[in-house]
Amino acid sequence: MSGLLLLGLLFFPLVEIIKSVKEPEMLTEIKRRYEIIRTSLPADARWERICSKCAIITGMDPSSGVVGSNVNKGYEIYICLDGEDIDSAMYVFLHELAHMTVSEYDHSTNFWNNFKDLRIVCQNIGVYSPVGTKKYCGKEVKD
């Protein structure tokens, strides 16, 4: 059997396997809402990085012990995917997006103010509903 034919026989089943693997629905929904956020944020210097940069968004298993993380100010954002609580997941996602609005890497007063304002804007555009106080991926989230 020629090498090319063998490669073809291996390649096509692999393509079918890849096509059958689906992204978790919650991650798909977060990405859909992210695109709405990027195209709907008002003109404001704080939101410039969010609107101009398209982050790679990856889901994490709840057993990782991490609720969310942001690599290099939005190059990659990791979000814990736990159940079907989309608003708690969005709270965590907006927290990670808020890190893109400040130059510092810690949770400064400026960060918290921007995070609060971002949640309000996202509530107004219909991609976020306040969560109150609850557990998500083993951590407390609190609006």
Residue ranges and their predicted role:
Residues 1-88, 104-143:
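Metalloprotease/metallohydrolase-associated module, dominated by Zn2+-dependent proteases
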Residues 91-103:
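Active-site recognition of the HExxH zinc-binding catalytic motif
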